[in-house]
Amino acid sequence: MEYMSTGSDEKEEIDLLIKHLNVSEVIDIMENLYASEEPGVYEPSLMTMYPDSNQNEERSESLLRSGQEVPWLSSVRYGTVEDLLAFANHVSNMTKHFYGRRPQECGILLNMVISPQNGRYQIDSDVLLVPWKLTYRNIGSGFVPRGAFGKVYLAQDMKTKKRMACKLIPIDQFKPSDVEIQACFRHENIAELYGAVLWGDTVHLFMEAGEGGSVLEKLESCGPMREFEIIWVTKHILKGLDFLHSKKVIHHDIKPSNIVFMSTKAVLVDFGLSVKMTEDVYLPKDLRGTEIYMSPEVILCRGHSTKADIYSLGATLIHMQTGTPPWVKRYPRSAYPSYLYIIHKQAPPLEDIAGDCSPGMRELIEAALERNPNHRPKAADLLKHEALNPPREDQPRCQSLDSALFERKRLLSRKELQLPENIADSSCTGSTEESEVLRRQRSLYIDLGALAGYFNIVRGPPTLEYG
């Protein structure tokens, strides 16, 4: 079978349709189809992790109607991956029976960092949930990161004192795909899933906490990332992708908000759109992902492979180095509600690569954004690219946030010593632009220093400064 082709007649019809549509018509169509601006829309996963779901659904419905308790839904307890997948399938299939009918919480836990008490795991008494505070922003900002159809909270088990991320998904939007990949595949660059608990009408997913926030949050608060920071993040994500792709898993939503900083690494999160391929080419029934990072072959819906993640990573690299996603500077969202047609006709967005990008990094990005997926490198190939393996003398001295903060303080002290007396004196009143910048930088150092000291968090990516 020709790659990316499901039949010559169908191909000719689609090409003919696209050829005769003008941009305004396409925009109107896409705006109606994708009225919601929430990225990463959930659709049922096509991977079958629990083949007897129909039989189990009938059995569960029968038990619920008879007033008997379903074993998976009677309490919060430790279990196997198979138990968790069975629980997820039952919750997803029996949504209509749960509204107002759950006297207490129930769930399956995979890790003993979560400590239930007598089959219960109650909010406030057993686990504390607080809105996630972005470490790069003012503590009072009240920022709560969002994933597809879910909020993320910081959770702490009251007995083990383990801090975790807790993603809340309304039960009517919960799908088994939300837990399948993380439960079945373990890797250091994939956020570990600790368990799932159903409280009332909301499923709570507990996983490794990325207390350093996401790449998107860092970009929004600190601006474009430096190249050695990008190298650090990219190597971690490519390791995760190499593992997933070796298992024939497509993540389908690689983007800055789904890359999270742990204490010493970067990890991938949000696997709700992921699928496990059963053949060399995945033939989708729907669009999966966030369109601004989508590859051309995903948009055409004629079939794609794990190479789609590589293209999305290339688009993410542009976002990291410029602080702006590809396409949006040249095609503002206000004028172009959808980028699907633009990506189909004009990809790859090589014009959006940063002007100060090194030759090696530019070569890597161009390779990742190769329009033909057959010519696009694998994750393992990109890991060997010279852009990600610079000479030792070119690597930064700072390998942690602590050392970066120390370096920042040293640089600030040096700048203050070099300032003329009249400017140094005016820094308290902010009478000059330079002194105002210095004052903000000092404030940033104090805020980050306090956070690092109190929470003992984030030791990556390596950077000379976070400002």
Curated annotation (Swiss-Prot):
UniProt-listed Enzyme Commission number(s): 2.7.11.25
Tissues showing expression: Expressed in bone marrow-derived macrophages, peritoneal macrophages, splenocytes and 3T3-L1 fibroblasts and differentiated adipocytes (at protein level). Highly expressed in adult submandibular gland, thymus, spleen and newborn digestive tract.
Keyword Membrane: no
Subunit structure: Forms a ternary complex with NFKB1/p105 and TNIP2. Interacts with NFKB1; the interaction increases the stability of MAP3K8 but inhibits its MEK phosphorylation activity, whereas loss of interaction following LPS stimulation leads to its degradation. Interacts with CD40 and TRAF6; the interaction is required for ERK activation. Interacts with KSR2; the interaction inhibits ERK and NF-kappa-B activation.
SMART domains given in the database record: S_TKc
Function recorded in the entry: Required for lipopolysaccharide (LPS)-induced, TLR4-mediated activation of the MAPK/ERK pathway in macrophages, thus being critical for production of the pro-inflammatory cytokine TNF-alpha (TNF) during immune responses. Involved in the regulation of T-helper cell differentiation and IFNG expression in T-cells. Involved in mediating host resistance to bacterial infection through negative regulation of type I interferon (IFN) production. Transduces CD40 and TNFRSF1A signals that activate ERK in B-cells and macrophages, and thus may play a role in the regulation of immunoglobulin production.
Keyword Phosphoprotein in record: yes
Post-translational modification: Autophosphorylated.
Gene3D superfamilies xrefs: Phosphorylase Kinase, domain 1 (3.30.200.20), Transferase(Phosphotransferase) domain 1 (1.10.510.10)
Entry-linked Pfam families: Pkinase
Family affiliation: Belongs to the protein kinase superfamily. STE Ser/Thr protein kinase family. MAP kinase kinase kinase subfamily.
Positions that bind ATP: 144-152, 167
Active site positions: 253 (proton acceptor)
PANTHER family assigned: MAP KINASE KINASE KINASE SSK2-RELATED-RELATED, MITOGEN-ACTIVATED PROTEIN KINASE KINASE KINASE 8
Domain of life: Eukaryota
GO cellular component: cytosol
Organism: Mus musculus (Mouse)
Phosphothreonine: residues bearing it: 80, 290
Keyword terms, alphabetized: ATP-binding, Cell cycle, Cytoplasm, Immunity, Kinase, Magnesium, Metal-binding, Nucleotide-binding, Phosphoprotein, Proto-oncogene, Serine/threonine-protein kinase, Transferase
Primary localization class, coarse: cytoplasm
Enzymatic reactions: L-seryl-[protein] + ATP = O-phospho-L-seryl-[protein] + ADP + H(+); L-threonyl-[protein] + ATP = O-phospho-L-threonyl-[protein] + ADP + H(+)
Disulfide bridge map: none
Entry-annotated residues carrying Phosphoserine: 141, 400, 443
Limits of the Protein kinase domain: 138-388
Top EC class of this enzyme: transferase
Reported consequences of knocking out the gene: Mutant mice develop normally and show histologically normal bone marrow, thymus, spleen and lymph nodes. Mice are resistant to the induction of endotoxin shock due to defect in the induction of Tnf in response to LPS. Mice display impaired host defense against T.gondii with reduced parasite clearance and decreased Ifng production. Mice also show increased susceptibility to M.tuberculosis and L.monocytogenes infection.
Protein name: Mitogen-activated protein kinase kinase kinase 8
